[in-house]
């Protein structure tokens, strides 16, 4: 009898264990909250392959790390995307302290969201942002071969590899002669042995790595890369880019037709906060008398032909990060000014030199390359010197003739500063029989206004029609579901910098009504936007003027009723549901009741 009871007890324990194991398996594999990222791609080495509709890969928490398994052969599947290839806004959601550290260190070292970059992996689809006419264009079969030169210093490993793989994935093999990576004496460990190992195991022999023994800066680093190149055309890219469909052929065709033509792609925008790839408007390069590059609208005369917005057009200057140039012409024209340091001003110098010395500079709308636009440069010069001022002085004294006084009118403190020996560059200008800077202003950039007693005022060339307001998707009260309290201004909703708190709802009070628009902004009483500090995630959210740039004012309602802030990767939380003060803060997203919000119509 006792033996039978013992057997029943054992069978019961076994049955219970199996039942719980099955339930836990179902929970952790299929519940939305346990997955955390229903739309997160798993990092891998294979190119993008869309999954069947409504089937998504599970999120691998290993991919939260810096790049813990880049060579272990994850399956490489990506999320099933919409037609515009937007990423899930929750890709940057923070679930634990490790996530928080990766994000914070990433912004500190790289000035963009490293957490998302690592989760994104090395391959992804990007939206085809070209004009519809571009897809119908054909190009000669005998285009010149390209050497892609990518100089990097302390770049994020995942961003660098995504740049390289985007080139390999979207460039015809017969046009890609080589990719030359120039490591400008980086200090990060993963850019040493890890990069060597990854290249050896996963990359084509066309990808070559050159390491500088000391910090040279972008300018001289590119010259090092060009000296190692053997392709017909040099294509310079920054180390945090992603090339688009058919990006190279439109750049090579004008160079084949005229080797003295220098071409630039349209630079699309990759958000530093979300890494979402979006189309950039068709604009051209200019500059101001402070010798800073700026974007200008394109005169209609440049786009009046039958090809419209798909036709290449002249640009007075280039942004400098991305361009293509015949290799022999690059050397004949004097490469870069090696007396310039690190970064800054070299793009204007080479732009002036191209135009003044017999070449032409075009922007090609059918070539699109995405670029992470950071809000600051995460590194400086080795000695803390003002390299922009040093380089601008060399540029002004070599190329601008009497118009350098326009620069000194804005920077009088630099008039007597040393800028090094420029005799070699002046000799180059004489040898190339270059035109005057006045010729450049008269013929290439007549819109540039000159100040001084004899200057004539000019009417504005371009009209600014203003920004279109984002479409409102929903209006209502923002209610914390645990307490049924409404999120309102602590003071008046027009007070910039004011806090928000959870208070009793008053359905007769219009100042409690939020608007949620297509830019993912939350606007209280049609006045100010809910905003978070991008650098201090411990600060509470505040009401600030709407800036329309996403990031700190971009909020997403998750499927589990969490309100996720894209820029900081955290969720809005009611600090103490029992307190009448109603303070709110940002916290690691855990799906708890205090993090559940509802925008009630």
From Swiss-Prot:
<dbReference type="GO" id="GO:0007220">
    <property type="term" value="P:Notch receptor processing"/>
</dbReference>
<feature type="glycosylation site" description="N-linked (GlcNAc...) asparagine">
    <location>
        <position position="508"/>
    </location>
</feature>
<dbReference type="Pfam" id="PF00652">
    <property type="entry name" value="Ricin_B_lectin"/>
</dbReference>
<keyword id="KW-0812">Transmembrane</keyword>
<dbReference type="InterPro" id="IPR035992">
    <property type="entry name" value="Ricin_B-like_lectins"/>
</dbReference>
<keyword id="KW-0325">Glycoprotein</keyword>
<dbReference type="GO" id="GO:0004653">
    <property type="term" value="F:polypeptide N-acetylgalactosaminyltransferase activity"/>
</dbReference>
<comment type="function">
    <text>Polypeptide N-acetylgalactosaminyltransferase that catalyzes the initiation of protein O-linked glycosylation and is involved in left/right asymmetry by mediating O-glycosylation of NOTCH1. O-glycosylation of NOTCH1 promotes activation of NOTCH1, modulating the balance between motile and immotile (sensory) cilia at the left-right organiser (LRO). Polypeptide N-acetylgalactosaminyltransferases catalyze the transfer of an N-acetyl-D-galactosamine residue to a serine or threonine residue on the protein receptor.</text>
</comment>
<dbReference type="GO" id="GO:0000139">
    <property type="term" value="C:Golgi membrane"/>
</dbReference>
<feature type="glycosylation site" description="N-linked (GlcNAc...) asparagine">
    <location>
        <position position="202"/>
    </location>
</feature>
<keyword id="KW-0333">Golgi apparatus</keyword>
<comment type="subunit">
    <text>Interacts with notch1.</text>
</comment>
<dbReference type="GO" id="GO:0060271">
    <property type="term" value="P:cilium assembly"/>
</dbReference>
<keyword id="KW-0472">Membrane</keyword>
<dbReference type="GO" id="GO:0018243">
    <property type="term" value="P:protein O-linked glycosylation via threonine"/>
</dbReference>
<keyword id="KW-0808">Transferase</keyword>
<comment type="pathway">
    <text>Protein modification; protein glycosylation.</text>
</comment>
<keyword id="KW-0914">Notch signaling pathway</keyword>
<dbReference type="GO" id="GO:0005112">
    <property type="term" value="F:Notch binding"/>
</dbReference>
<keyword id="KW-1133">Transmembrane helix</keyword>
<dbReference type="InterPro" id="IPR001173">
    <property type="entry name" value="Glyco_trans_2-like"/>
</dbReference>
<feature type="transmembrane region" description="Helical; Signal-anchor for type II membrane protein">
    <location>
        <begin position="8"/>
        <end position="28"/>
    </location>
</feature>
<feature type="region of interest" description="Catalytic subdomain B">
    <location>
        <begin position="312"/>
        <end position="374"/>
    </location>
</feature>
<dbReference type="Pfam" id="PF00535">
    <property type="entry name" value="Glycos_transf_2"/>
</dbReference>
<feature type="region of interest" description="Catalytic subdomain A">
    <location>
        <begin position="143"/>
        <end position="254"/>
    </location>
</feature>
<feature type="disulfide bond">
    <location>
        <begin position="571"/>
        <end position="589"/>
    </location>
</feature>
<feature type="disulfide bond">
    <location>
        <begin position="486"/>
        <end position="505"/>
    </location>
</feature>
<feature type="domain" description="Ricin B-type lectin">
    <location>
        <begin position="469"/>
        <end position="600"/>
    </location>
</feature>
<protein>
    <recommendedName>
        <fullName>Polypeptide N-acetylgalactosaminyltransferase 11</fullName>
        <ecNumber>2.4.1.41</ecNumber>
    </recommendedName>
</protein>
<dbReference type="InterPro" id="IPR045885">
    <property type="entry name" value="GalNAc-T"/>
</dbReference>
<keyword id="KW-0106">Calcium</keyword>
<dbReference type="GO" id="GO:0008593">
    <property type="term" value="P:regulation of Notch signaling pathway"/>
</dbReference>
<dbReference type="InterPro" id="IPR029044">
    <property type="entry name" value="Nucleotide-diphossugar_trans"/>
</dbReference>
<feature type="disulfide bond">
    <location>
        <begin position="529"/>
        <end position="546"/>
    </location>
</feature>
<keyword id="KW-0328">Glycosyltransferase</keyword>
<keyword id="KW-0735">Signal-anchor</keyword>
<feature type="glycosylation site" description="N-linked (GlcNAc...) asparagine">
    <location>
        <position position="29"/>
    </location>
</feature>
<dbReference type="GO" id="GO:0030246">
    <property type="term" value="F:carbohydrate binding"/>
</dbReference>
<keyword id="KW-1015">Disulfide bond</keyword>
<dbReference type="GO" id="GO:0061314">
    <property type="term" value="P:Notch signaling involved in heart development"/>
</dbReference>
<keyword id="KW-0430">Lectin</keyword>
<feature type="topological domain" description="Cytoplasmic">
    <location>
        <begin position="1"/>
        <end position="7"/>
    </location>
</feature>
């Amino acid at each position: 009898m006792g033996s039978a009871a013992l057997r029943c007890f054992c069978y019961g324990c076994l049955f219970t264990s199996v039942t719980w194991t099955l339930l836990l398996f179902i929970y952790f594999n299929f519940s939305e909250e346990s997955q955390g990222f229903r739309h997160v791609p798993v990092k891998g080495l294979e190119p993008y392959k869309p999954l069947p509709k409504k089937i998504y890969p599970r999120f691998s928490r290993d991919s939260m790390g810096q790049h813990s398994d880049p060579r272990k052969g994850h399956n490489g599947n990506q999320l099933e995307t919409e037609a515009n290839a937007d990423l899930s806004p929750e890709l940057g959601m923070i679930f634990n302290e490790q996530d928080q550290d990766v994000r914070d260190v990433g912004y500190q070292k790289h000035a963009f969201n490293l957490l998302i970059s690592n989760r994104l992996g090395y391959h992804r689809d990007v939206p085809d942002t070209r004009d519809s006419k571009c897809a119908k264009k054909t190009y000669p079969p005998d285009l010149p071969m390209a050497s892609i030169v990518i100089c990097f210093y302390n770049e994020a490993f995942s961003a660098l590899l995504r740049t390289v793989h985007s080139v390999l994935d979207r460039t015809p093999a017969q046009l890609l002669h080589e990719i030359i990576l120039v490591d400008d004496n980086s200090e990060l460990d993963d850019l040493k042995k890890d990069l060597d190992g990854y290249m050896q195991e996963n990359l084509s022999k066309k990808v070559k790595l050159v390491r500088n023994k000391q910090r040279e800066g972008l300018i001289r680093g590119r010259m090092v890369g060009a000296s190692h190149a053997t392709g017909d055309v040099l294509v310079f890219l920054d180390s945090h880019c992603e090339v688009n469909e058919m990006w190279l052929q439109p750049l090579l065709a004008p160079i084949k037709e005229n080797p003295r033509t220098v071409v630039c792609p349209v630079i699309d925008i990759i958000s530093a906060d979300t890494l979402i790839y979006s189309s950039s408007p068709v604009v051209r390069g200019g500059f101001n008398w402070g010798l800073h590059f700026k974007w200008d609208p394109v005169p209609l005369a440049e786009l009046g032909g039958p090809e419209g917005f798909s036709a290449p057009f002249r640009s007075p200057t280039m942004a400098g990060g991305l361009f293509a140039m015949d290799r022999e012409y690059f050397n004949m024209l004097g490469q870069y000014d090696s007396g310039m340091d690190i970064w800054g001003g070299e793009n204007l110098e080479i732009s002036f030199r191209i135009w003044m010395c017999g070449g032409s500079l075009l922007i090609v709308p059918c070539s699109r390359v995405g670029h992470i636009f950071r809000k600051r440069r995460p590194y400086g010069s080795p000695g803390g010197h003002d390299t922009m001022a040093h380089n601008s002085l060399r540029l002004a004294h070599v190329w601008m003739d009497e118009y350098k006084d326009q620069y000194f009118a804005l920077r009088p403190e630099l008039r007597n500063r040393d800028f090094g020996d420029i005799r070699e560059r002046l000799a180059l200008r004489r040898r190339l029989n270059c035109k005057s800077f006045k010729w450049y202003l008269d013929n290439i950039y007549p819109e540039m206004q000159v100040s001084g007693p004899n200057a004539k005022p000019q009417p504005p060339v371009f009209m600014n029609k203003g920004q279109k307001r984002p479409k409102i998707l929903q209006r209502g009260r923002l209610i914390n579901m645990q307490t049924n309290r409404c999120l309102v201004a602590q003071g008046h909703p027009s007070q910039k910098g004011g806090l928000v708190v959870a208070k009793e709802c008053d359905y007769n009070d219009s100042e409690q009504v939020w608007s949620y628009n297509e830019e993912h902004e939350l606007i209280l009483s049609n006045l100010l936007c809910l905003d978070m500090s991008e650098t201090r995630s411990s600060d509470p959210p505040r009401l600030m003027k709407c800036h329309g740039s996403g990031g700190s004012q971009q909020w997403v309602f998750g499927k589990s009723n969490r309100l996720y802030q894209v820029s900081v990767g955290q969720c809005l939380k009611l600090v103490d549901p029992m307190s009448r003060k109603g303070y709110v803060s940002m916290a690691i997203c855990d799906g708890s009741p205090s993090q559940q919000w509802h925008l009630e119509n």
